[in-house]
């Protein structure tokens, strides 16, 4: 699937315009996008990064990394996904960067999601749903998620987000109402961010292939 990821990432470069500040996500597919972005780094003003991992890779390519508080809203955000449904709703957060990813998506006029074909699903939920949680609320949130969804929350032991929080991965879900579930989980005290991108889905999904498919 690495070739499909590369093809999707390189197609996303078509959406990058001269003088842009580009929002950049996290993950294996985005790594290919960062590499491609580095080749045209002289054409853009810089990037806003969703993780320390992506920040390091951008800087390796000589791309200036900027603070979202100073840039204001962005024209373009490019990121991957763990799952994508036909309505371009996503599960994200496998790399534990979901909160910063959601912030940048919200701040961006256009959100381009780049995936390989294995990430396309008819209904979200086969991939465990990540939920970022304040550490002291981990058990409370897990109990409430179990009661609300019937899914099985599992603590991602040993993982601390860039924000200093923990992650619960909720298994055995079939998410037929992504917007409703995102809203409900966000109401649980202690939840920082839910890895459902449904209220703000992707605007365009690029599926890697020969040629890439644009949805």
UniProtKB/Swiss-Prot annotation:
Protein source organism: Xanthomonas euvesicatoria pv. vesicatoria (strain 85-10) (Xanthomonas campestris pv. vesicatoria)
GO cellular component, one term: cytosol
InterPro entries xref list: NagB/RpiA_transferase-like, Ribose5P_isomerase_typA_subgr, Ribose5P_isomerase_type_A
Protein name listed in UniProt: Ribose-5-phosphate isomerase A
Keyword entries, A-Z: Isomerase
GO biological process annotation, one example: pentose-phosphate shunt, non-oxidative branch
Subunit structure: Homodimer.
Binding positions (substrate): 26-29, 79-82, 92-95, 119
Enzyme's top EC category: isomerase
Molecular function terms, GO-annotated: ribose-5-phosphate isomerase activity
Known pathway: Carbohydrate degradation; pentose phosphate pathway; D-ribose 5-phosphate from D-ribulose 5-phosphate (non-oxidative stage): step 1/1
EC nos: 5.3.1.6
PANTHER family the UniProt entry points to: RIBOSE-5-PHOSPHATE ISOMERASE (PTHR11934:SF0)
Family to which this protein belongs: Belongs to the ribose 5-phosphate isomerase family.
């Amino acid at each position: 699937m690495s070739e499909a990821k590369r093809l999707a990432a390189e197609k996303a470069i078509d959406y990058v315009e001269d003088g842009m500040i580009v929002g950049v996500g996290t993950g294996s597919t985005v790594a290919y996008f960062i590499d491609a972005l580095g080749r045209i780094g002289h054409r853009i003003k810089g990037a806003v990064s969703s993780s320390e991992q992506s920040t390091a890779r951008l800087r390796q390519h000589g791309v200036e990394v900027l603070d979202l508080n100073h840039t204001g809203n962005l024209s373009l955000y490019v990121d991957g996904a763990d799952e994508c449904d036909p309505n371009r709703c996503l599960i994200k957060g496998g790399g534990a960067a979901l909160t910063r990813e959601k912030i940048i998506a919200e701040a961006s006029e256009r959100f381009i999601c780049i995936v390989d074909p294995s990430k396309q699903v008819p209904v979200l939920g086969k991939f465990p749903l990540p939920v970022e949680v304040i550490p002291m609320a981990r058990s409370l949130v897990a109990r409430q998620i179990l009661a609300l969804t019937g899914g099985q929350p599992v603590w991602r032991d040993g993982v601390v987000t860039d924000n200093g929080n923990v992650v619960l991965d909720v298994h055995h879900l079939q998410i037929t109402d992504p917007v409703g579930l995102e809203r409900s989980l966000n109401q649980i005290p202690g939840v920082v961010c839910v890895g459902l991108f449904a209220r703000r889905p992707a605007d365009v999904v690029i599926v890697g292939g020969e040629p890439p498919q644009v949805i």
